[in-house]
Amino acid sequence: MGVLVIGVASLAIGWGTIAYFSDTETSTGNTFTAGAIDLEIDGGLPVNFTDLKPGDHGENTISFHVESNDAWLCAEVTITEDKDVSCTEPEIEAEGNCTPEGDGELDDYLMIFAWADDGDNVFEPDETPLMTTPVKLTDYVGRFPIVDSTFNAFGAIGNPLEGGKDYYIGVAWCFGDMTIQNGTITCDGENVGNDAQTDTLKLDVSFEAVQARNNGNFKCVQPI
C-alpha cells in the first residue's frame, strides 16, 4: 500500500516538472479599409446648341479619371424630350401633322461618331472608334460599354481602366449626313428636311464606373 502511494506521489511530481519553450508575438493595428471608385468627368458635357442649321457640326471631348482603383466604364444615353415645339408653314407642308407637343424630327437628322481620343480633340485613323461608322443619335440610345470584359476602346480587351490615369472620348456630331474618309469627318446638310424646323431634342448621358478587381467578367448589359 505504501509503495502505491509513493508511486502516485512520484507521478504527480513528474507532471509538475514538464515545461515547454514558447514565445508570443502580437501584431497590432490591423485594419481593413474599403477602396473607392470615384469617377471624375471633365469637359464636353453638358452641350447646349440652339438655332441649329443644316450642315452645322462640332466636336466635344470628354475626359475620364478613375481615382485609385482600376474600373470598367459604361455609358447610357436616354432621350428625355423630343418635340416639334412650334409649327412653321414650311414644317407643316413637309410634315403634314405637326403639333407643338408632337414628336420632333430633329433626331432623324442628327448623326454622331465617337472614339477613344488621345486628348487632342481630333479623330485619327489609328484611334479606336466606339462604332464602326457614324450613326443616328437615336441608334445609340441605351447602355453600352466603353471598357468592359468584352470591349475596350483604349487597349486590349479584358484590361480595365487604370486607376489614377486620364482617358478621353471624342464625340463628333453633324446636323445632316456625316461621312469619314481617311480620318477626315465631313458633314453635309443637303438632305435635311423642313420637318425639323423649330424642333428640340434633349437627352441625358450618364457614365458608370464599376470595380474591376474580383469582377473580371463584368459586362455593360442592359439593366433589367
Task: Tell what function each PLM region has.
Residues 3-4, 10-13, 20-224:
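Surface-exposed, hydrophilic segments of mature proteins
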